[in-house]
C-alpha cells in the first residue's frame, strides 16, 4: 500500500474524530477515493439498469430497517433511563454500608459471635478497601493499578456514572475521602461520543488532579549525582512520567490540526484511545453495576469461566477443521491410489499412500498482551 493511502486513512480518521461528525468521515473517504482513482465512487453507475432497480429496492428496504432501528434505540434509551433511576436507591444503600454510614442488622447470636471473634474498634466501620479490591480483581483494571496507587485508592468511597446529552456520551465520577495525596474530593472522566449507539469516541476529558507536594503518583523524580570534578556539587533532579491508574484522568488528546500528527503517531494515538475507552467502559458496565461480585472475586471467576468456554469452542472448531483436513487428505490419497491402480494394473506391487496427520489444534482464544497507559 502506498504512503498516500496510508496517510489518508489516518489523517481522515483524525479529522473526523476532531470534527465529531460521521458524515465528514464518509465524505472524506469518498473524496480521497475519488482523488486516488480519478473516478466517482457511485457503484450504481457501474450496474446494468435491471440490477440498478433491484439495488434501489434493496435501499428502500434498508431505509425501513433503519427507521425501525432508530425507534429501537429511542425505546432502549427510555428503558435504560427508567432502570437507572430504579438502581439509584440500591447504590445509595451500598454506599452507606461500604462507608460505615449505617450498620447492617444482625441477630443477637451473630452480634455475640462477632464480639468474641474481633474487636469492633480495631476493625472499624464499613468495608475497607472495597473499591480498590473490586477493581484489582478485574483483569483490565488490575493492569493499570500500581502498588503506589493502592494507598490513594484506599480512600475511594464511591464510583458513579451518568449519561450526558450535549454532547452525547457518559461521565464517570470517583468520590474520594480526605487523603494525603490530592485535594480533589471528586475526580471525573467524561467521554464524548460521535455516535452513542455505536461506541465511536470523539474525545475524552479528565479532571486535573491537585496533588500535594511530593505526592504525585503519575510522576517520579530521578536524582543523578554530578560528575566528579563538576563545579555544581548538587545532585541533578529529573522528573519523568510513570505508570499509574491516575493517568486515566489525563487521557490522550486528538490534535485539532491533522497536519500535526504523522502516521505512526496516529496509530499509537488510536490504540491509546481504544485502551482508554476500554478502561472507562469496564468501570461503567462491570465494576459499578456488580461491585460486590468483583470485591468477592465471583465476577472474576465468571469472566474466567466465560473465557474458558470460548477457548473450548475455539478448540472444538480447530478439531473439526483438523478432521476435515484429514478427510480431505484421505480422499486425495484414495483418488491418487485409484489413479495409480488404473495406470499400473499390471504391476504386482502397488505403493500405498501414507496419511499425513494434521497437527492437533493449538491453544485457541489466547488474549493479546494489554498495553499499559503511559
From Swiss-Prot:
Residues 299-339 have a biased composition (Acidic residues). Residues 299-374 are annotated as: Disordered. Keywords: Chaperone, Coiled coil, Cytoplasm, Lipoprotein, Methylation, Nucleus, Prenylation. A motif (Nuclear export signal) lies at residues 47-62. GO terms for biological process: double-strand break repair via homologous recombination; nucleosome assembly. Residues 343-355 have a biased composition (Basic residues). Its main location: nucleus. Residues 26-80 form a coiled coil. A lipid is attached at residue 371 (S-farnesyl cysteine). Residues 372-374 form a propeptide. It comes from the Eukaryota. InterPro entries: NAP-like_sf, NAP_family. A motif (Nuclear localization signal) lies at residues 223-228. GO terms for molecular function: chromatin binding; histone binding. It is found in: Nucleus; Cytoplasm. GO terms for cellular component: chromatin; cytoplasm; nucleus. The modification Cysteine methyl ester is found at residue 371. May modulate chromatin structure by regulation of nucleosome assembly/disassembly. Could function together with B-type cyclins in the regulation of microtubule dynamics. The acidic domain is probably involved in the interaction with histones. Belongs to the nucleosome assembly protein (NAP) family. Binds preferentially histones H4 and H1 in vitro. Interacts with CYCB1;1. This is Nucleosome assembly protein 1;1.
Amino acid at each position: 500500500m502506498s504512503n498516500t493511502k496510508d496517510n489518508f486513512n489516518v489523517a481522515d480518521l483524525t479529522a473526523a474524530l476532531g470534527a465529531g461528525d460521521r458524515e465528514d468521515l464518509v465524505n472524506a473517504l469518498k473524496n480521497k477515493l475519488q482523488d486516488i482513482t480519478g473516478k466517482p465512487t457511485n457503484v450504481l453507475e457501474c450496474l446494468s439498469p435491471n440490477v440498478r432497480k433491484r439495488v434501489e429496492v434493496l435501499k428502500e428496504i434498508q431505509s425501513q430497517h433503519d427507521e425501525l432501528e432508530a425507534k429501537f434505540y429511542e425505546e432502549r434509551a427510555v428503558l435504560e433511563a427508567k432502570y437507572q433511576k430504579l438502581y439509584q436507591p440500591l447504590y445509595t444503600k451500598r454506599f452507606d454500608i461500604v462507608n460505615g454510614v449505617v450498620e447492617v442488622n444482625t441477630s443477637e447470636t451473630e452480634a455475640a459471635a462477632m464480639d468474641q471473634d474481633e474487636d469492633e474498634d480495631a476493625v472499624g466501620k464499613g468495608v475497607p478497601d472495597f473499591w480498590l479490591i473490586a477493581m484489582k480483581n478485574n483483569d483490565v483494571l488490575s493492569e493499570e493499578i500500581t502498588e503506589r496507587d493502592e494507598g490513594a485508592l484506599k480512600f475511594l468511597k464511591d464510583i458513579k456514572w451518568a449519561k450526558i446529552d450535549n454532547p452525547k456520551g457518559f461521565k464517570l465520577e470517583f468520590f474520594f475521602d480526605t487523603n494525603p495525596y490530592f485535594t480533589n474530593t471528586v475526580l471525573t472522566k467524561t467521554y464524548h461520543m460521535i455516535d452513542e449507539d455505536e461506541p465511536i469516541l470523539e474525545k475524552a476529558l479528565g479532571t486535573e488532579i491537585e496533588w500535594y507536594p511530593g505526592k504525585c503518583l503519575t510522576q517520579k523524580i530521578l536524582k543523578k549525582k554530578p560528575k566528579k570534578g563538576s563545579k555544581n556539587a548538587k545532585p541533578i533532579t529529573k522528573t519523568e512520567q510513570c505508570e499509574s491508574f491516575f493517568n486515566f484522568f489525563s487521557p490522550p488528546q486528538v490534535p485539532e490540526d491533522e497536519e500535526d500528527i504523522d502516521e505512526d503517531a496516529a496509530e499509537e494515538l488510536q490504540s491509546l484511545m481504544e485502551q482508554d475507552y476500554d478502561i472507562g467502559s469496564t468501570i461503567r458496565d462491570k465494576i459499578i453495576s456488580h461491585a460486590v461480585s468483583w470485591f468477592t472475586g465471583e465476577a472474576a471467576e465468571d469472566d474466567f469461566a466465560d473465557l474458558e468456554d470460548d477457548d473450548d469452542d475455539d478448540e472444538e472448531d480447530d478439531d473439526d477443521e483438523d478432521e476435515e483436513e484429514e478427510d480431505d487428505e484421505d480422499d486425495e490419497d484414495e483418488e491418487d491410489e485409484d489413479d495409480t491402480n488404473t495406470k499400473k494394473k499390471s504391476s504386482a506391487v502397488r505403493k500405498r499412500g501414507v496419511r499425513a496427520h494434521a497437527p492437533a489444534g493449538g491453544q485457541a482464544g489466547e488474549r493479546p498482551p494489554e498495553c499499559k497507559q503511559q
